[in-house]
Amino acid sequence: MSDAFDINDLKRRMEGAVNALKHDLGGLRTGRASASLLEPITIEAYGSTMPINQVANISVPESRMLSVSVWDKSMVGAVERAIRDSGLGLNPITDGMTLRIPLPELNEQRRKELVKIAHQYAEQGRIAARHVRRDGMDQLKKLEKDSVISQDESRVLSEKVQKLTDDTIAEMDKIVAVKEGEIMQV
C-alpha cells in the first residue's frame, strides 16, 4: 500500500468524534448521580471563567446526591449560582463550604426529551464521522488522479475507509443505546 495515504489519521479523527460524543452524553442526566453531570458548568472566578472542577471537588455520596466541596470560601456563592443557572434543574443546599445537590426523579416527559437530545448528539457524531470519511475519499481520488496510487489501491483503501466509518458509527449507536437505557431506567 502507498505511504501517501494515512488511514491511521482518519482512525484517530474518528476516535475523536466518538470521544466527543461520549463527553456530550456524559453531561446528560440519568436516574443516577454522576460527577460528569456538572462538568459543563463554568464559574466566574478570579476575573476569568473556569470549569467547576478547577474550583471544587465533586463527589457522589449517594445514588441521588452530588456533593461539591468548594476550595475557596469566597467562591461558594458563585458556584451555587452557576449550578442553579445551569439549566439542569438543580437546587444546591449550602452547608459551609460544601454544596449538597439532591437530584430529583426524572419524569417520563423529561426522560424522553433527554433521549431526543442524546439522539441529536449521536447524529452530530455520525455527521463528523462522515466528514472524516469524505475527506479520506477526496484524498484517495486526488492521489489516484495524480497517479500516486493505482485504481486498485484506491478501491482497496476506499473499502477500508468505508469499513472504518461503518465501525465508528456502529460504536456510536451502541454508546447511545446504553445511554438511552440509563436515561429511561426508573
UniProtKB/Swiss-Prot annotation:
GO terms for biological process: cytoplasmic translational termination. Gene3D superfamilies: 3.30.1360.40, Ribosome-recycling factor. It comes from the Bacteria. Keywords: Cytoplasm, Protein biosynthesis. One of its GO terms (cellular component) is cytosol. Pfam families: RRF (PF01765). It is found in: Cytoplasm. InterPro entries: Ribosome_recyc_fac, Ribosome_recyc_fac_dom, RRF_sf. One of its GO terms (molecular function) is ribosomal large subunit binding. Responsible for the release of ribosomes from messenger RNA at the termination of protein biosynthesis. May increase the efficiency of translation by recycling ribosomes from one round of translation to another. PANTHER family: MITOCHONDRIAL RIBOSOME RECYCLING FACTOR PSEUDO 1, RIBOSOME RECYCLING FACTOR. Belongs to the RRF family. This is Ribosome-recycling factor. It comes from Brucella canis (strain ATCC 23365 / NCTC 10854 / RM-666). The lineage of its organism: Bacteria, Pseudomonadati, Pseudomonadota, Alphaproteobacteria, Hyphomicrobiales. The gene is frr.
